[in-house]
Amino acid sequence: MAHCLHPEKFFPVVKSVALPPGSLNGKVALVTGGGTGLGKAIATTFAHLGASVAIAARRLDVLEKTADEIRSSTGGVCEPFQMDVKDPAKVAKAFDAVEKKLGHTPDILINNAAGNFIMATERLSPNAYGTIIDIVLKGTLHVTTELGRRCIQQKRGASVLSITTLYAQSGAPFVVPSAVSKAGVENMTKSLASEWAKHGLRFNAIAPGPIPTEGAFGRLFAGELKDSGDAMKASVPVGRLGHPEEIANLAAFMSSDFMSWMNGAIIDFDGGQQHIHHGSHMGQFLHEWDNEKWEETENLIRGRTGKEKKSKL
């Protein structure tokens, strides 16, 4: 057994907002992909903390419903803005609208717009992988550079936080377009951290492990969402999956002035999933050994060590 059987005892889920009230007062925060899932959770937390939140995506009807929910639950400011990250002209138009409605260029950008699906790579058409690259990599670049140009021209600072994935660093089968794109976003993060800090902009990323949302899990896994999640818990050492509110708290902290010295960081947020076997091909088998097997192995090692000592005398 490689994972904790009692996560509720040792690793409880805390969904309340972590930062003090007012921690983001006076900030304008733009969250792409903000209508659902992780983006919605992040936008909600930001509104709780006093930010004027702009949520952006293609479907205005979804955004309007989410904005109403966030305003109702937080008493804060949340406005919907239609944006297609694949189209630089539409990105610029959305920024114009945000500035007009909320007063100025965003102080915080959350790059959360994404697209993904599981498929054998040899079955992917150029259009299929091109769509993912257009959204995840090129779309993130469109939004980030639009913000950057405006901030540099206006001599404004900003915090840019991109949501990537664990396999951006390791690679993963059957999600090649997403892996390629997210790896590019992480390299953009580190590159701009060194290039644009002189202009007052800082760049970081969160690489989450499995955090169930209807959108992400629905696209990636066959069957019911719950079944997909239950099967994945065994791969996470802490014995449970993440929750959107948890990544929202981390995003708020990293985006806030409390973390103004953090720049160029990629933060893994996965319950230890990537380290479960520590790169050892034996790890998955060793977790299943009982005390008898370990005692047998210890005796073999002691016996071998004793023979080696005698041979040297």
Swiss-Prot record:
Species whose genome carries this gene: Caenorhabditis elegans
Enzyme class name: oxidoreductase
Domain of life: Eukaryota
Keyword Hydrolase recorded: no
Cellular component terms per the entry's GO annotation: mitochondrion
InterPro entries, sorted: NAD(P)-bd_dom_sf, SDR_fam
GO molecular function annotations of the record: 2,4-dienoyl-CoA reductase (NADPH) activity
GO BP annotations, alphabetical order: defense response to Gram-negative bacterium; fatty acid beta-oxidation; innate immune response
EC number(s) recorded for this UniProt protein: 1.-.-.-
Record family assignment: Belongs to the short-chain dehydrogenases/reductases (SDR) family. 2,4-dienoyl-CoA reductase subfamily.
Gene3D superfamilies noted in UniProt: NAD(P)-binding Rossmann-like Domain (3.40.50.720)
Binding site for NADP(+): 29-61
Protein name according to UniProt: Uncharacterized oxidoreductase F53C11.3
NADP keyword on record: yes
Keywords tagged on the record: NADP, Oxidoreductase
